[in-house]
Amino acid sequence: MAEDADMRNELEEMQRRADQLADESLESTRRMLQLVEESKDAGIRTLVMLDEQGEQLERIEEGMDQINKDMKEAEKNSTDLGKFCGLCVCPCNKLKSSDAYKKAWGNNQDGVVASQPARVVDEREQMAISGGFIRRVTNDARENEMDENLEQVSGIIGNLRHMALDMGNEIDTQNRQIDRIMEKADSNKTRIDEANQRATKMLGSG
């Protein structure tokens, strides 16, 4: 009889311990799920900010392209005026053949870069998960929730990986665009400075 009582006590203790571990494991999966959801939200906010930054860079580069077009027109007018005044003060062709100009604008004189960087689109592969994530002991609702939580965690982690790839691709694209903008800005500044010098000479000669 005493042995039966001891065995019952041991079984009850094992059951109590199993329940305790199940409760702790359930809380652990809940915390994991909360953390990855917070990370997902942070990732989404970062992607939105990168997208907004990309739109701003597009507007800036369009502005550089418009300045390039305007300068072409101004240089043409300056050349015509110089011919009318009997002067030869427009080194426009020399400028356009310079390495800096070609680097900024390529061979397309309208300011559209010939080789635009292509965005890399990462294919989203959906992985089918067979079976559960945990080894069942109590086989109750807690383990069902644990399994569901871990499945969600796994899915969100996969999404976070793709987000990280998207961020890396977008940052690379924007870095290349910033380099182009800097080159175009330098080219535009040089042209404006030279246009001012030509205008000063023409006014002085008048």
Curated annotation (Swiss-Prot):
Palmitoylated. Cys-85 appears to be the main site, and palmitoylation is required for membrane association. InterPro entries: SNAP-25_dom, SNAP-25_N_SNARE_chord, T_SNARE_dom. Keywords: Cell membrane, Coiled coil, Cytoplasm, Lipoprotein, Membrane, Palmitate, Phosphoprotein, Repeat, Synapse, Synaptosome. Residues 1-25 are annotated as: Disordered. The modification Phosphoserine is found at S154, S187. Residues 1-75 are annotated as: Interaction with CENPF. The modification Phosphothreonine is found at T138. Residues 19-81, 140-202 form the t-SNARE coiled-coil homology domain. Residues 111-120 are annotated as: Interaction with ZDHHC17. Part of the SNARE core complex containing SNAP25, VAMP2 and STX1A; this complex binds CPLX1. Found in a complex containing SYT1, SV2B and syntaxin-1. Found in a ternary complex with STX1A and VAMP8. Interacts with HSC70 and with SYT9, forming a complex with DNAJC5. The interaction with SYT9 is inhibited in presence of calcium. Isoform 1 and isoform 2 interact with BLOC1S6. Interacts with CENPF. Interacts with EQTN. Interacts with HGS. Interacts with KCNB1 (via N-terminus); reduces the voltage-dependent potassium channel KCNB1 activity in pancreatic beta cells. Interacts with OTOF. t-SNARE involved in the molecular regulation of neurotransmitter release. May play an important role in the synaptic function of specific neuronal systems. Associates with proteins involved in vesicle docking and membrane fusion. Regulates plasma membrane recycling through its interaction with CENPF. Modulates the gating characteristics of the delayed rectifier voltage-dependent potassium channel KCNB1 in pancreatic beta cells. This is Synaptosomal-associated protein 25.
